[in-house]
Design a protein with these regions (language model features):
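Surface "functional belts" at beta-alpha junctions
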Residues: 2-103, 131, 136-137, 141
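Acyltransferase
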Residues: 98-146
Length: 146
């Protein structure tokens, strides 16, 4: 009877950054590389030991105006494997990039412990992970085989 507790990848990335000293009003912006200049991202703010969701998970094409309104108001810390490609485009003084942030198992465990135990084992049999976009598997084509 070990429960399966779902934990959001972007929140795990945030938890990996929280050990550093951040300003109280800073927003955390984890980014997963989607393709070209697209990332999967959300905005979070630390409130005590909890993460407060400022904007929901979304797919975003990064351009010079991305996050412009938010950056005009407060500092935003960008990290994750999608942040590096955004560094040359998002140049606002309130934009801070944190290198080498990867999901850590210890952070996943901490987030799982903080999550309310609202999902019981029966419900977990029907649990489906959240994917922002539908996965479409293309048939593989091996050269020389038909």
């Amino acid at each position: 009877n070990i429960p399966l507790i779902p934990v959001d990848t972007l929140q795990v990335l945030c938890a990996s950054v929280l050990s550093g000293v951040l300003p109280d009003n800073a927003l955390l912006c984890p980014m997963l590389d989607a393709r070209r200049m697209e990332v999967y991202t959300a905005l979070y703010q630390q409130q005590g030991t909890q993460l407060s969701t400022i904007s929901e998970v979304q797919s975003m094409i990064i351009d010079a105006d991305a996050f412009a309104q938010t950056l005009a108001q407060q500092p935003v810390y960008f990290f994750g494997n999608g942040a590096a490609k955004c560094q040359s485009v998002i140049t606002h003084p309130n934009a801070h990039f944190v290198d080498n942030v990867v999901p850590q198992a210890q952070c996943m465990g901490l987030l799982a412990e903080m999550r309310p135990n609202s999902l019981d084992v029966k419900q977990m049999a029907y649990y489906e992970p959240f994917y922002l976009k539908e996965f479409v598997a293309a048939p593989s084509h091996i050269k020389g085989l038909k």
